[in-house]
């Protein structure tokens, strides 16, 4: 019996294990963590005949090696155990690649980029599904990809949000359509250099039959048609700003979306704020038209699209203050976009687990629009120093989300603020398991005011 080792007892790892077990593999799942909830999951999986090892890493010391290793997205591709596995000739892949092996008979729409992936993925799914297609979203949102394989449905399209981590471990995944939303420095602690990060992202587009790129992203625009001669480009700046052949472009003209020379819909049908969300919409429309979806379905989907949780999500209004949850803004560029999208003066809640990157545009937005910054998490002291050195004095280190929300409500009237914006510019892992948990906590606290 062929043997498979799965690393990571999360949703992706469990789905991968069940796929392989169903196909007759002997499956061992390992996770270096241990907790009562994981113990309960272990008990359930072992009833299914899946071996689960908690509190330990995979070992390749024994002579009885696995034929296949599947890694969850959070496991670094350059982890020593994975380097050793590849040196030993063991087939080593990510969960998304395993799903591709099961589901490659269906066309895939793959969306990657530093920022904008989730909203673009959600917009694509809404449009494709409004057209009556069986087109679930997976990857970073929706299902784990292997959960779709377990369903054994016939999918018209698979719409996958794909991170750089997942691309690294998915060497054969080849979408019918690939979208690249944005490119700015992020995850450099894992990928080391901007060039490495770029090449990882680019590899997915290079394997895609058709490429859609955001012409309003400065880095992608700089690379331009020299590297992506056959791409379909988008721009909210109009036809004149398009790269490449305008007849293959999607752009805004007099507040209408124009795709490949045809009027599609008024852009103001989209309820989400911000130019960046219009950019996301244009890429989704480009994908829909390339997939043959009619204008009527596109228009209806845009008009009814509710937005995405944790991405400039309106939570409530308290004493004239709008509380906005932008917890997904985990780097400086995303947080700067968040500030650009809300009215001023704003009260900003920022901080968490800091990332490497260029904070200058973000700090410039703070100086232009923010009445007070409330700093939380591990980055609070460092952010305070940076704001001070930039000549910005109106900040407070409040440490926790509870204090931040309460303090924002207190300060709002005196500062004549219009909005309280959680847009952290940081990862969440110092205080929360994920940006979703952080945003949910902010939402709960805001609604309790």
UniProtKB/Swiss-Prot annotation:
Tell whether Endoplasmic reticulum is among the UniProt keywords.
no
An example of a Gene Ontology cellular component annotation for this protein is: cytoplasm
List of residues binding ATP: 113-119
Q: List the disulfide bonds.
A: none
Q: Which pathway is this protein assigned to?
A: Cell wall biogenesis; peptidoglycan biosynthesis
* Alphabetical GO biological process terms: cell division; cell wall organization; peptidoglycan biosynthetic process; regulation of cell shape
Q: Does the keyword Nucleotide-binding apply?
A: yes
Q: Which residues form the signal peptide?
A: none
> What's the chief localization of this chain?
cytoplasm
- Give EC number(s), comma-separated: 6.3.2.9
Q: Which reaction does it catalyse?
A: UDP-N-acetyl-alpha-D-muramoyl-L-alanine + D-glutamate + ATP = UDP-N-acetyl-alpha-D-muramoyl-L-alanyl-D-glutamate + ADP + phosphate + H(+)
Q: Where in the cell is it found?
A: Cytoplasm
Keywords, sorted A to Z: ATP-binding, Cell cycle, Cell division, Cell shape, Cell wall biogenesis/degradation, Cytoplasm, Ligase, Nucleotide-binding, Peptidoglycan synthesis
Annotated GO MF terms? ATP binding; UDP-N-acetylmuramoylalanine-D-glutamate ligase activity
Task: Return the InterPro entries for the record.
Answer: Mur-like_cat_sf, Mur_ligase_C, Mur_ligase_C_dom_sf, Mur_ligase_cen, MurD
Q: Which family does it belong to?
A: Belongs to the MurCDEF family.
Q: What does this protein do?
A: Cell wall formation. Catalyzes the addition of glutamate to the nucleotide precursor UDP-N-acetylmuramoyl-L-alanine (UMA).
Q: What is this protein called?
A: UDP-N-acetylmuramoylalanine--D-glutamate ligase
Q: Which organism is it from?
A: Microcystis aeruginosa (strain NIES-843 / IAM M-2473)
